[in-house]
Amino acid sequence: MGEVAGGAAPGPPRSGLVSIIIGAEDEDFENELEANSEDQNSQFQSLEQVKRRPAHLMALLQHVALQFEPGPLLCCLHADMLSSLGPKEAKKAFLDFYHSFLEKTAVLRVPVPPSVAFELDRTRPDLISEDVQRRFIQEVVQSQQAAVSRQLEDFRSKRLMGMTPWEQELSLLEPWIGKDRGNYEARERHVAERLLSHLEETQHTISTDEEKSAAVVTAISLYMRHLGVRTKSGDKKSGRNFFRKKVMGNRRSDEPPKTKKGLSSILDPARWNRGEPSAPDCRHLKVEADAEKPGPADRKGGLGMSSRDRTVGTPGQDNPGVSLHPLSTDSVDSREPGVDTPQEPGDTPPQGPTSLEPLAPPESTEDNGETESPEPGDDGEPGRSGLELEPEEPPGWRELVPPDTLLSLPKSQVKRQEVISELLVTEAAHVRMLRVLHDLFYQPMADGGFFPLDELQNIFPSLDELIEVHSLFLDRLMKRRQESGYLIEEIGDVLLARFDGAEGSWFQKISSRFCSRQSFALEQLKAKQRKEPRFCAFVQEAESRPRCRRLQLKDMIPTEMQRLTKYPLLLQSIGQNTEESTERGKVELAAECCREILHHVNQAVRDMEDLLRLKDYQRRLDLTHLRQSSDPMLSEFKNLDITKKKLVHEGPLTWRVTKDKAIEVHVLLLDDLLLLLQRQDERLLLKSHSRTLTPTPDGKTMLRPVLRLTSAMTREVATDHKAFYVIFTWDQEAQIYELVAQTSSERKNWCNLITETAGSLKVPAPASRLKPRPSPSSIREPLLSSSENGTGGAEMAPADARTERLLNDLLPFCRPGPEGQLAATALQKVLSLKQILLSTEEDSGAGPPRDGDGVPGGRAPGPVHTQEIEENLLSLEVAIRQLEELEEEFCRLRPLLSQLGGTLSPNLAAPERSAQTGLS
């Protein structure tokens, strides 16, 4: 078995480790075995020791891949690789780490701590901050340490018995240990390279699952590249789903030279995330041969750089014949993969390829300036060639502008034209991508009957409208460019026509509809591929078409969202390099409209994700306990439908019912409710709990799991920096819930959100009450025509008009439900506190309290009494707060009643006196 797996028969341990065969009858067997064990496994005592030795690590990885689940070990190694990246690269690499090891459908998924799994389920990984990402990685790695330690221990024990691979290769490194470090490291890498090459050739022996075998080999190859080992599979398509790190000095020998296409390091596979192949597309290689000649000289000249050197696009997409010039660092620096995302909260694009849009589409080239040759594989789609970029579009504005004019342009104008050129070319690429999505996927899915038409339209909503809108915008840009002779002076009106006014509102509506359903679409398509082999084969066949440019369907769906994030940056850069004030104002206004559209779309995406999450919770919600309960306060929640609510926040908390009883709950903060859900398998239970309290008549009180926020308030627990109280009033009865968060910052966040949500449900402020409202008569009486009413509104007597106005002002104070007994309730709480304090005095056996004693008897109350005192004080605080609010309302009500008294008859003035008496 070892010979097949390792490529060399393990055989007996090498000379120098066990010099002779020792029989079990030898009396020194155990002592010599222990000595040899320590010497032989000195390189494998811990993962920290072995992970910097490529050859030894290859032996360990080979053993683990054949004997164990390799996910934990590879997860720890890739986490170590991620920690060596810079902040920007690490944030982007976390997405690939998530999709490789943490995602539920990942081939190499590892056990994830519940706290991390919950956060990842409720938050898109690309929206997680860098600090939280690092914390998640640390927690995941810590949870894998036990499994990795067991694998190391097994390897060490098997190595003593000569059952581990690559022993002969490792023995060649022994003489060099402790001598020349540089020479030793070079030999380590050389041996590791040969071992890795053999592993790639025999990867089918790792697992019967070909996908898993390929994923394991790819993960190992990527980490070997991180250690400086040259690999053969570093550029293969199987390398997707793993982040890449550029290894200087070891990469170029195995890769085709990047200057072959005139592209800068922005298209280096190390700069891109999963799902994006790095090998160049050779379909238009011949066309680009002439365009690439001045590339090196242009790169030296800065502004003379070839446009393809700085194009932001997707690896694997060619850019024939389109000259796209670089942007300065103060405009859109396309050298950084993450610049295409506006630096605004919530504007991070959803998971998917890092690039915001593909490269420029095929257009007219130097070899053929009038017609565009169809792409290979598009023969079966007649009439579609015109859907690509119009053949009249020239290869680049620099090549058509007279040299004298080009030299006379100021630097800012050159930058401006470059950004406008990028806007045009990338818009053409986006239109091409949308049409590919429509022609190769949407329409064949409809024709093939894979989905019902209404369901398919829900997966690709408003796709036709988006193609029409973007095509119209592209036509306007092309027309303006041709009219201006490739030096566009005014573009603000074209931008405003697209992003402002009615056109902007329509664009916002259809883009919100499409983007908000992309998560739903990806889940539906993934589920369909798992269940139906015919659909899976159809998708794979469509993705193999040349028009897809080796992009997968899951990479194409997020392109609209990614395109929206590009607009604000491009328009902002155009505005910064526009000197004429009127034109600059138009461009900046268009950029602001783009930001508003993007903000609206992001909010629509979040709302849709919240709705899908609520639907999942509603499906798992178990209302059995509520329906069986006789509590009248819970009767209205027996058919609770949370999908009609708005999700504000959610998370795990600990509910301290009593001092000795704590329950782990998942809390949902909705727009008007707080739900305390208990997990039981896949179900979510809403269950009440009882708590014994001395002051209550029956000795018990029920704590309900559904809480209305109209009377909610929060207080932090002074003795626990993670705990807080949520206080509610149920029918003049205050209930106190003690909840514990995982951190103090989470406690603060929960308190703020509950307070803000409850505050939005309170009675409107006095200023808002002065807004015009329907008159009381219009609420109580059906609408009457002027003929039925006798006179029109203009003929109303002045006194009646004044009465109507005063009644309109009084309307906000008309609320259902009794407000009395507040003072009596507060007094009852005071008496309860007094009773507790007196009972504390009796228990202590002391005499009557003296003046100045803080506590009766001079002693502090016990824990039970302390909790009762605290709860009664909080209840008293609620009652006092309600009394203060009532007093404020009465102060505002009194002058209105006085004014109304002058216009009403004496028999109508009586309610004023009764109201004053009742409120006082």
From Swiss-Prot:
Gene Ontology BP annotations: Rho-activating G protein-coupled receptor signaling pathway
Gene Ontology terms, MF aspect: G protein-coupled receptor binding; GTPase activator activity; guanyl-nucleotide exchange factor activity
Pfam family, one: RhoGEF
Domain DH: from-to ranges: 415-604
Modified residues (Phosphothreonine): 694
Key words, A-Z: Coiled coil, Cytoplasm, GTPase activation, Guanine-nucleotide releasing factor, Membrane, Phosphoprotein
Phenotype reported upon loss of the gene: Mice have reduced response to angiotensin-2 and lowered RhoA signaling pathway.
Composition bias, Acidic residues: 364-380
Chain positions found as Phosphotyrosine: 737
GO annotations of cellular component type: cytosol; plasma membrane
Protein name: Rho guanine nucleotide exchange factor 1
Source species of the chain: Mus musculus
Organism phylogeny: Eukaryota, Metazoa, Chordata, Craniata, Vertebrata
Gene, per the UniProt record: Arhgef1
